[in-house]
């Protein structure tokens, strides 16, 4: 291995080590309470070295968010694996349950998705990085849009604006999962997460169905 190749490998290993440290710190302290000093200490690097790799706490979150979006899309792709054509309702149900599995199996990534909401995050990262996150996010939303458009073409759904309907479904999923993340709210509602999630998804599908 050449000296240059070794340095590049060491640089990438350091970058990944810092991201792992940030992941641990953000989960332990919460993104908003965590500081760059905390991350540098956990990664065992100087603060100056940390800033050579990531210019802000939001930039660290952005890179973790990209990891999470990649993981989410893998769940969605797996959900669509089938040896026969899927109906529009089957597609939406599979998307819904894939998102729930993502929430259950990758709760840290779900928390990062929620932490990235807000004007401050958008303004704190570079336009290029923000566009990368936006593009990755759109891939998942587009799968929902395409399923709704399929239902409209087949006469199963009545919907004037599939993209707006997809946004509503996304808000519905996140609303249920965020609500049920809190023990007090779960106790208030008195049903399990999967039960409420299924009820919300089926209510959405009933609203989409074209009149008989």
List the predicted regions and their residue ranges.
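Short hydrophobic clusters on alpha-helical segments that form packing/core surfaces
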Residues: 18, 22-26, 68, 99, ...
């Amino acid at each position: 291995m050449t000296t240059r190749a070794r340095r590049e490998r060491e640089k990438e290993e350091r970058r990944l080590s810092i991201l792992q440290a940030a992941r641990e710190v953000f989960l332990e302290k919460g993104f908003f309470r965590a500081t760059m000093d905390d991350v540098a200490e956990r990664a065992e690097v100087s603060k100056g070295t940390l800033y050579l790799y990531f210019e802000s706490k939001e930039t660290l979150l952005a890179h973790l968010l990209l990891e999470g979006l990649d993981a989410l899309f893998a769940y969605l792709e797996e959900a669509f694996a089938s040896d026969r054509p899927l109906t529009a309702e089957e597609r939406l149900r599979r998307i819904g349950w894939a998102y729930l599995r993502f929430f259950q199996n990758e709760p840290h990534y779900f928390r990062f998705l929620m932490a990235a909401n807000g004007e401050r995050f958008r303004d704190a990262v570079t336009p290029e990085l923000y566009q990368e996150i936006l593009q990755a996010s759109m891939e998942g939303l587009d799968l929902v849009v395409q399923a709704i458009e399929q239902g409209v073409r087949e006469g199963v759904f009545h919907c004037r604006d599939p993209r707006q309907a997809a946004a509503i479904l996304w808000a519905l999923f996140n609303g249920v999962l965020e609500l049920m993340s809190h023990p007090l709210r779960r106790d208030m509602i008195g049903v399990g997460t999967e039960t409420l999630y299924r009820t919300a998804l089926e209510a959405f599908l009933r609203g989409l169905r074209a009149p008989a």
